[in-house]
Amino acid sequence: MTREPDSTVEQQHGNGHLENGTEQDTLDFSRQIKTEDLSEALQTGIPHRPCQLSQASMMGGGQMTGDFTSLHPLQQLVLVPSHLQSASQYLLSQSQSGQQGLLQQNHLSLNQQQGGILQPQTGLGLASQAVGCPGLPGSSLESHLEMGHLHAPKHFSVVPEDPSDLEELEKFAKTFKQRRIKLGFTQGDVGLAMGKLYGNDFSQTTISRFEALNLSFKNMCKLKPLLEKWLNDAESAPSDTALTPSTNYAQLSEMFGRKRKKRTSIETNIRLTLEKRFEDNPKPISEEISMIAEQLVMEKEVVRVWFCNRRQKEKRINCPMNIPLKSPVYNSRMVPTSVSLGSMSMTPVHNTMTSTVTSSCSPVSSSRPSSPTSGLEPSSPGSSLNSPKPTVNTSSYNNSSSWYRWNHSQYFH
């Protein structure tokens, strides 16, 4: 029984020392906020304080619960630096494993749950330390952000810059087309010449797409040096031939492709002479063509081609005049009628005119069947008008009354 008061006295004595220690800690931490020189000493001493709390909590259970409320300032003082260290470690240790990052996040959430009502005060402490103490981990956040901002452009500048950009390619394609036309080469000639010279055979479509900028950027960059080399060789070839006359033009044409034939322009006086010769003989023979070429000091092939083109032009000019008109439907009907009328003899008409006038002049007689002396078939002339083509009996050609009845003007009225 005597030992129990001694133990309680020792516990109270220990609690007194603990309270003295907490007061001393609060003073030290307040000095840490006001002064910047004690930052390193506090960082080394603060991590040991949670161990003292754990040892003290293991001592008297009932009595420590009563004094636990008095230790809230100490918990606040301990939580502030640990929160700062964990935040700085979380930002600085991005290259570490994911498990360590998860543990730090859990530690932050536990500290926030234990703090409870003390979160606004810890926020104020964080703001004050971040502003007043550049040596603390708060300043390391800004330095880390600045370092990250400096290292960021390295990720975007991965692709190196190409010396030949789109503007240079567009300019080269335009100049290449102009110089190629000036030299007299076609797009197909360029493709064949590049195949003979450099071993890279290109089609006419590829050269056309290059000049029109319809190829991809990568293919344009590959094709540009080859075309530039061919263009320089083609332009320097005539100057070399002037220096060395032994060089044959056929060899150059085989090397750089087939040159396009230039359009022949004929003078006005020569054209008039050729027109006169064409009026005399539109289709001269080979000997006459050679004689005309010698007289006009021209090539025989040029004269021959001119006569061929002139004959084609003459066909185009005279073609609408020579085409016969399509005969209409009534033409085929009128031709045999006119022939038959022209072949009839007019002598019976004068002989029997008086006998047929009375029968043809009356409109009633046209609707009635004719008399046996008329020489027509039993069908009446009124019914024959309804048919599209009247049928005339061959025996009526000998009788003048039938012919007069068909051709008299009053009959149609």
Curated annotation (Swiss-Prot):
One of its GO terms (molecular function) is DNA-binding transcription factor activity, RNA polymerase II-specific. Residues 259-318 bind DNA. Residues 1-26, 346-398 are annotated as: Disordered. InterPro entries: HD, Homeobox_CS, Homeodomain-like_sf, Lambda_DNA-bd_dom_sf, POU, POU_dom, POU_domain_TF, TF_octamer. It is found in: Nucleus. Gene3D superfamilies: Homeodomain-like (1.10.10.60), lambda repressor-like DNA-binding domains (1.10.260.40). The keyword Transcription applies. Residues 354-398 have a biased composition (Low complexity). GO terms for cellular component: nucleus. GO terms for biological process: regulation of transcription by RNA polymerase II. Residues 161-235 form the POU-specific domain. Keywords: DNA-binding, Homeobox, Nucleus, Transcription. Its main location: nucleus. Transcription factor that binds to the octamer motif (5'-ATTTGCAT-3') and regulates cell type-specific differentiation pathways. Belongs to the POU transcription factor family. Class-2 subfamily. PANTHER family: POU DOMAIN, POU DOMAIN, CLASS 2, TRANSCRIPTION FACTOR 3. This is POU domain, class 2, transcription factor 3S. The gene is pou2f3.S.
